Amino acid sequence: MSVSPVSIVSTPVAVSASPAGAPDQPVQPVTVRWRGREAYEASFDAMRAFTDTRTADTGDEIWVVEHPPVYTLGQAGDPAHLLVADSGVPLVKVDRGGQITYHGPGQIVVYLLLDLRRRKLMVRALVTKIEEAVIETLAAYNLASVRKAGAPGIYVASGVHEGAKIAALGLKIRNGCSYHGLSLNVKMDLRPFLAINPCGYAGLETVDMASLEVAADWNDVAHTLVGRLIANLDGASAAADKPHALEQSND
């Protein structure tokens, strides 16, 4: 997978009006950074540093990456959910919510570095917007998917793989700002999921778009997903999908 580094800027919009009726200041545009294939630890360190050093004036960013094979275990995760100790895939303990998951080639990983206070956005509302973006993205490829109460992520709605997980979600909120994010399986080697209880659920089937007979290009799906995320987050049109919305970046 090869991705040219670009920065996509969404349209700034006012999120609400003040009690006196005067419009609030518009939310700053979201910058989208395409980081290509990157070691998990490098992304993890970078998003923590970004969050630790951001100020009230720092713009929000979305990072899109693809990782080499790695298991990540959430802050309160149980190591017992890694069923095969000598799988050859490294395990990294991280500070997001949730249990254990797998990242690898052929999977889109999106990190959301957002100032929730500035956006006047509660965590539950953010999760809903992310899940809606994934559902809308899959629908663009004629795949029906759903949420599950109490189990963040997105699941296949019907058919032979009904109930299988196709996208995972895990966030960390620090000082009113989010990092970590979501992963969507496009076309990947799914065998490493057999060595874990995905997200802490024993026997949970994990699939990708290819398993559902959709031959989708990683870049195309990633651009669709980013467009839906931006549209859901700030109310802008999904201009992020369109070539005129792309600007070259030095990232």
UniProtKB/Swiss-Prot annotation:
Key words, A-Z: Acyltransferase, Cytoplasm, Transferase
CDD domains: LipB (cd16444)
Record-annotated site: Lowers pKa of active site Cys: 165
Ranges for domain BPL/LPL catalytic: 56-241
Catalytic activity, reaction form: octanoyl-[ACP] + L-lysyl-[protein] = N(6)-octanoyl-L-lysyl-[protein] + holo-[ACP] + H(+)
Gene assigned in the entry: lipB
Species for this entry: Burkholderia orbicola (strain AU 1054)
BP term (GO), one: protein modification process
Lineage: superkingdom: Bacteria
Gene Ontology MF: a single term: lipoyl(octanoyl) transferase activity
Physiological role: Catalyzes the transfer of endogenously produced octanoic acid from octanoyl-acyl-carrier-protein onto the lipoyl domains of lipoate-dependent enzymes. Lipoyl-ACP can also act as a substrate although octanoyl-ACP is likely to be the physiological substrate.
Pathway in which this enzyme or protein is active: Protein modification; protein lipoylation via endogenous pathway; protein N(6)-(lipoyl)lysine from octanoyl-[acyl-carrier-protein]: step 1/2
SUPFAM superfamilies documented for this protein: Class II aaRS and biotin synthetases
Binding-site residues for substrate, renumbered to this chain: 96-103, 168-170, 181-183
Family: Belongs to the LipB family.
Subcellular location(s) per record: Cytoplasm
Protein name per UniProt: Octanoyltransferase
Active-site residue list: 199
Broad class of the protein's primary localization: cytoplasm
Record-listed E.C. numbers: 2.3.1.181
Example of a GO cellular component annotation carried by this entry: cytoplasm
Remaining remarks: In the reaction, the free carboxyl group of octanoic acid is attached via an amide linkage to the epsilon-amino group of a specific lysine residue of lipoyl domains of lipoate-dependent enzymes.
InterPro entries named among the record's database cross-references: aa-tRNA-synth_II/BPL/LPL, BPL_LPL_catalytic, Octanoyltransferase, Octanoyltransferase_CS
